Amino acid sequence: LKRRAEQQAETRLRIVEAAVALHGSVGPARTTYSMVAEAAGVQRHTLYAHFPDERSLLLACSGLAVERDPPPEPANWPEGADRLRAGLSAVYAWYRRNEDLAGCVLRDAEVHDLTREVSELRLGPTARRWQENLGAPLDPVQRAVLRVMLGFPAWRSLVRDSGLAPEQAVAAAIRAIEGSVA
């Protein structure tokens, strides 16, 4: 009995890992159960036995991704003047490590209700903590710019589209935030 439970757990993990890889390459909205089953090396009925619907699979995938590389927590950032730099550096480093998956998931969240729901569930509270924590000493206009700069599209534009090094992207974001006074 114990061996069977271990095999089922291994199969489940293999399915979730295959789905996460597909979500990072084609996106959750375009990932089909057939694609996941093939990538995991299981039959479709095995996949359905573990994940009877798309929501259960997406929740498992997002849970695994966040467990393996949790988004940065503001509690770990220093107080005072270095907080904004530390926070943006941590968020941007997390985006860099999760670029493919984040890019596909956030793209699909624009058009796929379930992806949007699960993204909000997994990342919404943390993103709000980033904004509240870093935005506390800022005026309303600066907080608005902070919200933009904390977004994945801003990071991608600064680093990928503009070719800035990570520390340059953080410095540019800080200048944009601090330079926008109400």
Regions from the language model: what does each represent?
Residues A21-S25, T31, L59-G87:
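Amphipathic alpha-helical linker/stalk segments
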Residues H50, A60, A172:
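Residues in the recognition helix of alpha-helical DNA-binding motifs
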Residues L1-V26, R30-V42, H50, R55-S56:
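Basic, helix-initiating cap at the start of DNA-binding domains
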Residues S89, A93-L106, V111-A144, V170-V181:
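Amphipathic alpha-helical packing segments from all-alpha helical-bundle domains
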Residues E132, R143-P166, G179-A182:
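Amphipathic C-terminal alpha-helical segment
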Residues F51, R107-H112, M149-F152:
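Short helix-capping/turn signature of helix-turn-helix
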Residues R14, A18-V26, P72-E73, L101, ...:
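Solvent-exposed, amphipathic alpha-helical segments
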Residues H45:
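Key DNA-contact positions within bacterial/archaeal DNA-binding proteins
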